[in-house]
Swiss-Prot record:
Residues 162-175 have a biased composition (Basic residues). It is found in: Nucleus. One of its GO terms (cellular component) is nucleus. A motif (Nuclear localization signal) lies at residues 165-169. Residues 21-36 have a biased composition (Pro residues). The keyword Ligase does not apply. Residues 1-41, 154-195 are annotated as: Disordered. InterPro entries: ALOG, ALOG_dom. This is Protein LIGHT-DEPENDENT SHORT HYPOCOTYLS 7. One of its GO terms (molecular function) is DNA binding. Pfam families: ALOG_dom.
Length: 195
């Protein structure tokens, strides 16, 4: 009799004593393990892809991703300007070309070039990850590159901030740059040959 009262007490209190007979548990379907958490980039890429696909579905008539062209992408980028936070001065504005304007103006807020460039990069990758062929990727088209270049240049002029492309560092080749005994590099030039 004492064993019956101790058995229930052990279960309720989380006793580590082994039970005499395990109770059969009803078989419940196990949920699949949670996928690993996405990186910030992957999460943003997924959000951007879903937003773009929703934009295409909202068109009249709706556009399937397989029928998407550069004109749809350009329309999408211009649509996004309404949510921009970067002041871009127009040509008639007194602050056009000034890095730090002294006052307020009514020039529009737009998406910054860097944001658009990063967005296109993510959508380009997402297109291929969702079954698109690289050679038919509308985000990689020349028209998109031209548009981004024009936005970059016009925003740089309007904001007085010149765009400077980062120079790629040359990889150092240890075979080409070995030092000579006199402290000069191993490469020869016409001035070294003349002396």
């Amino acid at each position: 009799m004492a064993s019956h009262s101790n058995k229930g007490k052990g279960i309720a209190e989380g006793s580590s004593q082994p039970q005499s007979q395990p109770q059969p548990q009803p078989h419940q379907p196990q949920s699949p393990p949670n996928p690993p958490a996405l990186s910030r980039y992957e999460s943003q890429k997924r959000r951007d892809w879903n937003t773009f696909c929703q934009y295409l579905r909202n068109q009249q008539p709706p556009v399937h991703i397989s029928q998407c062209g550069s004109n749809h992408i350009l329309d999408f980028l211009q649509y996004l300007d309404q949510f921009g936070k970067t002041k871009v001065h127009i040509h008639g504005c007194v602050f056009f070309g000034q890095v730090e304007p002294a006052g307020q103006c009514n020039c529009p807020l737009k998406q910054a070039w860097g944001s658009l460039d990063a967005l296109i990069g993510r959508l380009r990758a997402a297109f291929e990850e969702n079954g698109g062929l690289p050679e038919r990727n509308p985000f990689a088209g020349g028209g998109i590159r031209v548009f981004l270049r024009e936005v970059r240049d016009s925003q740089a002029k309007a904001r007085g901030v010149p765009y400077k492309k980062r120079k790629k560092r040359k990889k150092r080749n240890p075979m080409k740059s070995h030092d000579g005994e006199d402290g000069t590099t191993g490469t020869s030039s016409s001035s070294n040959l003349a002396s």
